[in-house]
């Protein structure tokens, strides 16, 4: 168990940076869920969702975030940030649209409004895949805040390694 005098590990520090974003995470998921971005049926909502995703990833430091043409009519976004010398490239993947549900019954709340029930958040696309998109944003913000503080000469990227990411 950790005592007050025990230094926080890198993973603990990173978790703290994530925990301090809880209001922002909820706000981001609320916004992401609010887009009725149904693949193939709601082009204007998909365009609005793509614009929000583009802005959000640009704000967390991803460069040249842009929409590419796709043969299926979806609006995939791509961005890139060069890794520091000697560091690996990491791919983050998620999507911001949802599949048509043929107006299936079962929702007792508006599916396009994030709703909290018994400590859980519900909203259309929150599990597939808008929640993951928001998790990527939170992780990128946390890494940008935390990594510069934890850099050491022997760990040029702040000691962040795949082991830490997997354990996290």
Locate predicted features.
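Acidic/His- and Gly-rich active-site-bordering loop/insert found
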Residues: 4-126, 142-160
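Acidic, glycine-rich active-site loops and adjacent beta-strand->loop/helix elements
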Residues: 96-98, 165-168
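DPxDG-like acidic metal-binding loop motif
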Residues: 114, 132-140
């Amino acid at each position: 168990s950790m005592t007050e005098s025990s230094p926080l590990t890198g993973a603990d520090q990173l978790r703290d940076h994530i925990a301090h974003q809880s209001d922002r995470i909820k706000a981001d998921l609320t916004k992401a869920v609010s887009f009725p971005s149904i693949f193939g049926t709601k082009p204007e909502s998909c365009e609005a969702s793509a614009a929000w995703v583009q802005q959000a990833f640009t704000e967390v430091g991803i460069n040249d975030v842009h929409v590419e043409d796709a043969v299926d009519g979806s609006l995939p976004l791509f961005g890139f940030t060069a890794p520091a010398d000697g560091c690996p490239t990491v791919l983050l993947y998620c999507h911001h649209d949802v599949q048509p549900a043929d107006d299936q019954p079962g929702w007792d709340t508006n599916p396009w409004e994030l709703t909290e029930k018994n400590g859980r958040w519900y909203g259309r696309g929150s599990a597939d895949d808008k929640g993951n998109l928001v998790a990527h944003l939170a992780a990128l913000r946390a890494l940008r805040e935390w990594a510069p503080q934890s850099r050491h000469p022997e760990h040029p990227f702040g000691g962040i390694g795949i082991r830490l990411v997997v354990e996290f």
